[in-house]
């Protein structure tokens, strides 16, 4: 029986057509696109088309597209908004991807002031609180478009408009949003936007959208890839162009069929498994993402048993990296620790089938029951009221 892959918010399988599009640029068309000879010209024209393909998905001009090595490098473009001669404050959220949070923590250690917007129990932001922080001391706002754990969507268009009106640069990490949601930047107030190929059924390349007129300070010197330094990774960039077109072609499928399968997965599990619930904003989230909290057990244990039966998912907990704390996203949402430890993220793609979802719905309930039978929080058919000190809460 084939394995079931439901960890597409971590990375995606490479589209077969995209592999075919890449191959010639490893063998026949291998020139440096900056060269004047025909080998370089061939690749240069292909890169121009890839830039246009990528721009077409986002609705912006191809001159505003910069290719990078990954989404994290694109996220670090927020450094370009900072200067000792200008404002020193940053605004982000407590639930950002580590690519942004770790950078903000580093900047805080260097003397910058970082304001982290809190979220409510559904992972939503308070725009009134956000508005109160917009002032002349703020240099840049960086807010993800969609949360990678819960799929909760943030109102980045409105937040960008508010920042722009205050004269503040706005960046969004759209890595999780781009293949699943229509994005049109033509009339947007967003100054910078980050993407990653490996969430688009492509590997090894990132994209930075930089609105024309936005100041940008290079982190890596060189001239080849516009404001970013370094010779272009031609095969990966060209594949990214194809990935962009394929994402646009499958957009409706993501928002109808993938969402239907996601909803079926959630309903099927919750109908059978008691003391479980979906985290995040139920009305405003990605169509492919289901983050389910299974109370009174450990998410990592669920993942290990799922893996034994050929199902790949991921946990909201950081335990696999040596920490016993739930993820920063679950803690920020104030999910009870008996539930936050048991979160599992199922993230679907256009390759997910009905049969796979049916299989997951069959396999999850007995795994949860097996783990609860050995949990100090569980006895018989329900939770223990006073489990003692077997597991102490790791946060308030």
From Swiss-Prot:
Pfam families according to UniProt: Aminotran_5
Record's catalysed reaction(s): (sulfur carrier)-H + L-cysteine = (sulfur carrier)-SH + L-alanine
Entry-linked InterPro entries: Aminotrans_V_dom, Aminotrans_V_PyrdxlP_BS, Cys_deSase_NifS_bac/arc, Cysteine_dSase, PyrdxlP-dep_Trfase, PyrdxlP-dep_Trfase_major, PyrdxlP-dep_Trfase_small
Top-rank taxon, per record: Bacteria
GO molecular function, one term: cysteine desulfurase activity
Gene3D superfamilies: 1.10.260.50, Aspartate Aminotransferase, domain 1 (3.90.1150.10), Type I PLP-dependent aspartate aminotransferase-like (Major domain) (3.40.640.10)
Ligand binding (pyridoxal 5'-phosphate): 71-72, 148, 176, 196-198, 231
Cofactor: pyridoxal 5'-phosphate
One BP term from GO: nitrogen fixation
Signal peptide positions on this chain: none
EC number in record: 2.8.1.7
Catalytic-site annotation from UniProt: 319 (cysteine persulfide intermediate)
UniProt enzyme class: transferase
Record-listed N6-(pyridoxal phosphate)lysine modification sites: 199
UniProt binding sites for [2Fe-2S] cluster: 319
Keywords per UniProt: Iron, Iron-sulfur, Metal-binding, Nitrogen fixation, Pyridoxal phosphate, Transferase
Role noted for this protein: Catalyzes the removal of elemental sulfur atoms from cysteine to produce alanine. Seems to participate in the biosynthesis of the nitrogenase metalloclusters by providing the inorganic sulfur required for the Fe-S core formation.
Family: Belongs to the class-V pyridoxal-phosphate-dependent aminotransferase family. NifS/IscS subfamily.
Quaternary context: Homodimer.
Protein name, as recorded: Cysteine desulfurase
Protein's organism: Azotobacter chroococcum mcd 1
Lineage: Bacteria, Pseudomonadati, Pseudomonadota, Gammaproteobacteria, Pseudomonadales
């Amino acid at each position: 029986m084939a394995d079931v892959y439901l960890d597409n918010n971590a990375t995606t399988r490479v589209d077969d057509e995209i592999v075919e599009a890449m191959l010639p640029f490893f063998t026949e068309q291998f020139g440096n696109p900056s060269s004047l000879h025909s080998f370089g010209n061939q690749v240069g024209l292909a890169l121009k088309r890839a830039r246009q393909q990528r721009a077409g998905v986002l609705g912006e001009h191809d001159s505003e597209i910069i290719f990078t090595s990954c989404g994290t490098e694109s996220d670090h473009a927020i450094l370009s908004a900072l200067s000792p001669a200008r404002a020193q404050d940053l605004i982000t959220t407590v639930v950002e991807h580590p690519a942004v949070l770790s950078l903000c923590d580093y900047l805080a250690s260097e003397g910058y002031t970082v304001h982290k917007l809190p979220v409510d129990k559904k992972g939503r932001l308070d725009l009134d609180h956000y508005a109160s922080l917009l002032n002349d001391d703020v240099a840049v706002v960086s807010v993800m478009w969609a949360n990678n754990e819960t799929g909760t969507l943030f109102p980045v268009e409105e937040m960008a408009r508010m920042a722009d009106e205050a004269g503040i640069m706005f960046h969004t990490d759209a890595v999780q949003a781009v293949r699943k949601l229509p994005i049109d930047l033509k009339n947007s107030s967003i100054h910078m936007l980050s993407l990653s190929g490996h969430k688009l059924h492509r590997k090894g390349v990132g994209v930075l959208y930089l609105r024309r007129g936005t100041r940008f300070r290079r982190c890596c010197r060189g001239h080849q890839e516009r404001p970013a330094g370094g010779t272009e990774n031609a095969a990966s960039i060209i594949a990214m162009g194809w990935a962009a077109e394929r994402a646009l072609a499958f957009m409706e499928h993501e928002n109808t069929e993938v969402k239907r399968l996601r909803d079926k997965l959630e309903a099927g599990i919750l109908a059978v498994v008691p003391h479980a619930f979906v985290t995040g904003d139920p009305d405003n989230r990605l169509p492919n993402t289901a983050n389910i909290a299974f109370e009174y057990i450990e998410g990592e244990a669920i993942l290990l048993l799922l893996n034994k039966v050929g199902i790949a998912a991921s946990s909201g907990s950081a335990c696999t990296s040596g920490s016993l704390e739930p993820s920063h996203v679950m803690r920020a949402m104030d999910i009870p620790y008996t539930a936050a430890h048991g979160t599992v993220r199922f993230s679907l793609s256009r390759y997910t089938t009905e049969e796979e979802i049916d299989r997951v719905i069959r396999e999850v309930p007995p795994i949860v029951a097996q783990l609860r039978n050995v949990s100090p929080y569980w006895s018989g058919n329900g939770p223990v009221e006073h489990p003692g000190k077997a597991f102490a809460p790791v946060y308030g």
